Amino acid sequence: MALYEHVLLARQDISQQQVDALVEQFKGVLEANGGKFGKVENWGLRPLTYRIKKNRKAYYTLVNIDAPAAAVAEMERQMRINEDVLRFLTVRVEEHEEGQSAMLTRRDDRRERDGDDRPRRREGGFDRGDRGDRSPRRPRDNEAGEGA
């Protein structure tokens, strides 16, 4: 049997429990056709790069699969029918990655570094303040006391 990595994007308006139920449903389809599910990673609700079927966010789930090609094809057919599945991608790999995927590792490192998952923003609007790289302004002629 071949090894696959499968990423599933589910709609934003369903709950995490419904996403887990979807994964279990597809696990049943795969096992009925002679395949096995490996590691399942829920990456959570993440923003999409562009809108897909009027959704700006999606629940991402990574699944390691050990199955024949016919079982994967049947699972993908079921995913195309399901309205809660926005997109999916199945890639054949030589071996499954041990431990956490790069997505979860990067997110955990970022949280440890600054304690928050959101990027920092600069304070203020258009005025960014003095950067220290310019000399002080010289006064204009009318500011020097020669009023008009």
From Swiss-Prot:
Region (Disordered) location: 96-148
Lineage: Bacteria, Pseudomonadati, Pseudomonadota, Alphaproteobacteria, Hyphomicrobiales
Function of the molecule: Binds together with bS18 to 16S ribosomal RNA.
GO biological process, one term: translation
SUPFAM superfamilies attached to this UniProt entry: Ribosomal protein S6
Family matches, as Gene3D superfamilies: 3.30.70.60
Keyword field: Ribonucleoprotein, Ribosomal protein, RNA-binding, rRNA-binding
One family name in Pfam for this protein: Ribosomal_S6
Keyword field contains Cell wall biogenesis/degradation: no
Protein name: Small ribosomal subunit protein bS6
Sequence similarity: Belongs to the bacterial ribosomal protein bS6 family.
One Gene Ontology cellular component annotation held by this UniProt entry: cytosolic small ribosomal subunit
GO terms for MF: small ribosomal subunit rRNA binding; structural constituent of ribosome
Species name: Brucella suis (strain ATCC 23445 / NCTC 10510)
Domain of life: Bacteria
